[in-house]
A protein has these predicted regions:
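PLD/PLD-like phosphodiesterase catalytic module centered on the HKD motif
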Residues: 1-222
């Protein structure tokens, strides 16, 4: 096996861009991010099929990325991405949910003859950090198979795990979460949601002594 630094041109993303027409992709990932999907969207269009194993206890907020994905969220394309991703999954993918947590991820590419050509394992979840697009906090270990024997071993692990699970498309937590993000929110809900976000955790700001000093009638201020 070879270790991947997941920086520069030695990233999981670069390995997955080897997708060609007729390739299949199998993913077992602790997390799934819309922005990881966006980074591979064009390549994924060439897949003939995809299999995805996700943890059923993964928080749905992970779909919108982590702190490092703030600039991507600010592009305000999450709703469109959710629709596109859901359409892609319903069209060619099968999804299975694992009741336990996944502590490492496995990604396997197979050619048109269904032979594994690329296989990765380790801290390579289907997120921007896992693909090497954004920095990842802490240390991680990602391995890529360098021989057909090594790739076949990871492929067998995925196949055995998959055979023990039941597929959930078109239903399932991931599909439902994507549908929720993609749905149009009623206009009358936006204003109270904004107020709740702005005022949450700010009870002390409405305290009388914070607004005006009860003893003097003057609020102490500072000019910088």
């Amino acid at each position: 096996v070879r270790l991947i630094s997941n920086t520069g041109s030695d990233r999981v993303l670069d390995e997955l861009k080897q997708i060609t027409e007729g390739t299949s992709l199998s993913v077992a990932s602790a997390s799934f991010s819309l922005f990881a999907y966006a980074s591979l969207r064009e390549s994924l269009g060439a897949l003939r099929e995809a299999q995805l194993i996700v943890s059923s206890d993964a928080p749905t907020e992970q779909l919108l990325g982590e702190d490092a994905d703030r600039s991507l969220r600010n592009q305000l394309i999450a709703k469109w991405l959710a629709r596109d991703c859901l359409s892609f999954l319903l069209k060619i993918a099968q999804i299975a949910e694992l009741s336990q947590s996944l502590f490492q991820s496995v990604l396997v590419l197979r050619d048109a003859n269904n032979q594994p050509t690329t296989a990765l394992s380790g801290d390579c979840s289907f997120t921007t950090a896992g693909l090497g697009i954004t920095p990842k906090a802490g240390f991680s270990l990602i391995q890529v198979a360098e021989s057909a024997l090594e790739a076949s071993a990871l492929d067998r692990w995925f196949t055995q795990t998959w055979s023990q699970l039941s597929t959930t498309v078109p239903k399932g937590l991931l599909a439902n979460a994507l549908a929720t993000i993609a749905a149009d929110a009623p206009a009358f809900e936006l204003y109270p949601r904004m107020l709740m976000h702005l005022l949450s955790g700010g009870d002390e700001l409405l305290d009388e002594d914070q607004i005006i000093n009860a003893a003097t009638g003057i609020r102490e201020t500072a000019v910088w």
